[in-house]
Each structure stands twice: as structure tokens, then as C-alpha cells.
Amino acid sequence: MCSQLWFLTDRRIREDYPQVQILRALRQRCSEQDVRFRAVLMDQIAVTIVGGHLGLQLNQKALTTFPDVVLVRVPTPSVQSDSDITVLRHLEKLGCRLVNRPQSILNCINKFWTFQELAGHGVPMPDTFSYGGHEDFSKMIDEAEPLGYPVVVKSTRGHRGKAVFLARDKHHLSDICHLIRHDVPYLFQKYVKESHGKDIRVVVVGGQVIGSMLRCSTDGRMQSNCSLGGVGVKCPLTEQGKQLAIQVSNILGMDFCGIDLLIMDDGSFVVCEANANVGFLAFDQACNLDVGGIIADYTMSLLPNRQTGKMAVLPGLSSPREKNEPDGCASAQGVAESVYTINSGSTSSESEPELGEIRDSSASTMGAPPSMLPEPGYNINNRIASELKLK
């Protein structure tokens, strides 16, 4: 019987760059490898239990067979456990292999839940406080006093650097309390001064680091997100950094994810966040990779009678220019060429038609395996100071 693969996403984000790239890559690979492919929107699905048996309806039609693998891309900050996760759990109960799994997505939709999962595993992370009630922010102003000032304040459901504040003192915290929405809790986190305005985004697929990008703020703010106007440049990662990112991915049960690492003065790292629905427009550009294609290759490897998940070779991309460059940090000129400023809400320049059944696709995707990332010894903070002038 022919294998079946679904790409499941949300109507609100279906035309964003990551979804368009993954969709094209999956369509091409499924067409070439005789795999039945279907692109599905979350609101097209109805889950059923009839006669004590689980069932599934798609566009009001009952299905008699179900996909072997489902690649999931849902807007993580707005994922609802009573709706979206219900559908994902149902698919999993039907025997579908989800990428990422429902529990893995839940581990990342709330920033404090992420730290709860990582706690007890020796993962370096900032001291963090949070609370249960929606109206308890003001109470936490005193409770979080041991964290000192300035203190980082984040919405547990924030994304893309939004709803993040650096409070100078208790009075500033009180002002923030009156300005924010209280529909979700906030967390209070110890400020990592040495990583102000910079971090490293690491993308992990199938338990392997496929690339890393240094992100830097250009306006002095604490957040370095490219969606807020920050810049990103390809950055070699030490073995310690790679192993930390892989450890976090494994603890959270992720098939693919983005891990954000804060940079300490001694060259070590502290985990800032994990992203189950990682965006990769800036990452693709800065690192000259095809993350959508890499995720598609990994997903295909999970189909029956294929590799069982672990990719033997990282299926990333590297240009001829990259292959001819020496190992180590890029020159100042190379850094300038690799830095991109990404505006919030950027999408692909080509709009994708309504998601539906697979059709022949003329879109081509690249697939040459890259060399492993170099691991030279270097001081990343000095690099930032001398080349990006941001320290």
C-alpha cells in the first residue's frame, strides 16, 4: 500500500514563508517517491468517536485510511489545548506519526512549561519565577525580588520578541503591570547582562544541529529577533553549544526546533527559549540553507520502510562560495555580506494557492549535503565587538 503523508497547518499562517517552503519541498519529494500527499488546514478536520471507535472527517467526508506521517505547522503562541491539541492527539491515537508530537508542542507553547521540562537535567538557564492566577502579576513584584534588577519580564505565550520587557526597578515593574494584558501569566527572569541584545539561534532537525546564526539588536534593545529589526549572520557553534541545543531538543521531544542560547563572557551558553514552530526566513538567508527542504527530508525518512528518523547525513545546502571559504569565523567583509535585516511579517514573494490535494509542482528544491559546521576556537564577544560594532 502506498504511504500517506500530510502537511497540516493553520489558515492564519499558511502563506508565511516557512509553510510555503515546506509545502513545496514535500510536494516535490512525495511526487518523486510515489507517496500520497495531502495538504490540510486545521479547520478542515472533524474528529469523531462512533461506536466506540476513533474516526476522522476531512471536508465533511469520513476517511477510511489515515496518514502514516503528519508534519505539523501551527501558530504556537495561539495553540489551544481544547481545540488544536485535541485534533493532534486524535491523529496520534489513530496511529499517525506527528512531526512534532502534541506533547512536544505543548512543552514549548508556554515559556515556563519549557523550563519546567528542562529543570533537573543539568541544563543551564536563568533563574525564573512565574505564577498561577491571571491577576497575580502585582503580587510577583515582591515575590521576584531575589532575582534582582534589572529583571526580564516575558509573557509566557509571547513570540517573536513581543511582550518582553526589561524592568529597571520595582517602580518600573509597577508601571508595566498597568500596561500589559493579563489574559496569560508572565514570567520573571534573571537578567543576563553579557548577552544583552545578542543571542545564537540554533536549528535542530532529527537530533542534529543543521546550523546556527548569531542575532544582534541594532537599536540597543534587549531582544535580538530579526522580526524586530535585528540582524543575523551565520555563526560557527562550539561543540558545547551544539550538545546543549541537542540536549534541549531531546528533553523536549522535538523532531525539529529552534533553540535560542544566551552568550556568557566565558564563552559558555545559557538556554533562553525553545521554539516548536521555528521561523527560518532570516536563518535560510544568513546561513544559505534550505531549512524547509531539510525538514521535508527528515519527515520523509519517518515513512514506513524508510530510515527511522535519524538522518545519516545532514541534508542542508551550501553554495560553491561557502565550500571554498576557509573554516573559522568569517571576515568582516563576509559578515557584512551575510547580515540581513528582516521586517516583521515577511512572507514569500510568491503566494501559494489554497492548500489541497497534491499536484505536479515545477518548484525545484536543492538537496546537496553540506560539510559539518566548523568548530574553531574563538571569542564570540570579541567577534561581535570588532565586526558588528554592537558591544
From Swiss-Prot:
Cited function: Catalyzes the synthesis of N-acetyl-L-aspartyl-L-glutamate (NAAG) and N-acetyl-L-aspartyl-L-glutamyl-L-glutamate.
Pfam families named in the record: RimK
Molecular function terms, GO-annotated: ATP binding; metal ion binding; N-acetyl-L-aspartate-L-glutamate ligase activity
Origin: domain of life: Eukaryota
Binding site for ATP: 154, 189-199, 215
Annotated Gene3D superfamilies: 3.40.50.20, ATP-grasp fold, A domain, ATP-grasp fold, B domain
Span of the signal peptide: none
Sequence ranges assigned to domain ATP-grasp in this UniProt record: 115-300
Amino-acid positions noted as binding Mg(2+) 1 in the UniProt annotation, renumbered to this chain: 260, 273
Binding-site residues, Mn(2+) 2: 273, 275
Other remarks on this protein: N-acetyl-L-aspartyl-L-glutamate (NAAG) is the most abundant dipeptide present in vertebrate central nervous system (CNS).
One Gene Ontology CC term in the entry: cytosol
Entry keyword DNA repair: no
Gene name tied to this protein: RIMKLA
Protein source organism: Homo sapiens (Human)
Binding site residues for Mn(2+) 1: 260, 273
Keyword entries, A-Z: ATP-binding, Cytoplasm, Ligase, Magnesium, Manganese, Metal-binding, Nucleotide-binding, Phosphoprotein
Annotated region described as Disordered, given as residue ranges: 341-379
Any Gene Ontology biological process: protein modification process
Protein name per its UniProtKB record: N-acetylaspartylglutamate synthase A
Cofactor names: Mg(2+); Mn(2+)
Catalytic activity: N-acetyl-L-aspartate + L-glutamate + ATP = N-acetyl-L-aspartyl-L-glutamate + ADP + phosphate + H(+); N-acetyl-L-aspartate + 2 L-glutamate + 2 ATP = N-acetyl-L-aspartyl-L-glutamyl-L-glutamate + 2 ADP + 2 phosphate + 2 H(+)
Annotated EC: 6.3.2.41, 6.3.2.42
Family the UniProt entry places it in: Belongs to the RimK family.
Start-end of Polar residues biased regions: 341-350
Subcellular location: Cytoplasm
Binding site for Mg(2+) 2: 273, 275
Phosphoserine modified-residue sites: 319
